[in-house]
């Protein structure tokens, strides 16, 4: 009888252990499939401003090119293309997680807006009215101000393997720029290993718009070497 009770207890404990282990997820299972550039998409998932979700989107073409984009700032995170010897190489600088993009001031790969580059003394004149913009760079307005579009979350729609559409709404008075603006960026990979970036914007007031991408390139994929060494 004691042996029977002992066996029953062992089986009961074994069952509990099995259930607990079955409910656990191994570190390998928690990790998403890595991109060709070695990025883990999970490291780009977070919530900004309470209700805006960030993600990493992976674009590919028929030739094997891969481009990773996060909807935080519409940023290109990596571009994997074959070099002259056919070796796949990441030719842009960037971070491997969303936290660094949030906490380390940079324009790596970002979609810049409303206005790329500097506006002298942060002043513009529209329809006879002078508007004072934030002076966030030595007395001038740089890249749309301190909270430019490179720090905003875009709505993302990946329509196919090689095309991503990013959209954002910029309210009237955003960094003191006039007009409600709906901005759109379309990233498309072509079959000949090029990336096409198409910008468009609509507004309900006269305003200034000058969008661009702020990627930093190094063609041999090694940021410790000068780009001039590849020419």
Indicate residue ranges for each PLM-predicted region:
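C-terminal motif of bacterial Sec signal peptides marking the signal peptidase cleavage site
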Residues: 21-23
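Hydrophobic helical h-region of N-terminal Sec-dependent signal peptides
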Residues: 15-18
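An exposed, glycine/acidic-rich loop-and-rim segment of catalytic or binding clefts
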Residues: 25-65, 71-231
């Amino acid at each position: 009888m004691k042996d029977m009770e002992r066996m029953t207890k062992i089986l009961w404990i074994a069952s509990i252990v099995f259930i607990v282990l079955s409910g656990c997820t191994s570190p390998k299972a928690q990790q998403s499939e890595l991109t060709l550039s070695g990025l883990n998409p999970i490291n780009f998932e977070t919530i900004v401003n309470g209700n805006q979700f960030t993600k990493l989107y992976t674009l590919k073409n028929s030739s094997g090119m891969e481009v990773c984009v996060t909807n935080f700032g519409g940023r290109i995170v990596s571009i994997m293309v074959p070099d002259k010897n056919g070796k796949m190489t990441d030719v842009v600088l960037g971070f491997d997680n969303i936290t660094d993009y949030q906490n380390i001031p940079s324009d790596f790969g970002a979609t810049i807006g409303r206005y790329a580059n500097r506006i002298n003394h942060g002043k513009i004149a529209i329809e006879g009215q002078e508007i004072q913009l934030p002076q966030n760079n030595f007395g001038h307005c740089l890249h749309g101000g301190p909270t430019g579009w490179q720090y905003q979350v875009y709505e993302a729609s990946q329509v196919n393997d090689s095309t991503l559409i990013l959209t954002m709404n910029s309210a009237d008075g955003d960094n003191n720029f006039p007009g409600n603006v709906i901005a759109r960026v379309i990233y498309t990979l072509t079959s000949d290993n090029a990336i096409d970036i198409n910008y468009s914007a609509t507004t309900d007031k006269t305003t200034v718009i000058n969008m661009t991408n702020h990627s930093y390139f190094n063609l041999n994929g090694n940021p410790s070497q000068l780009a001039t060494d590849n020419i």
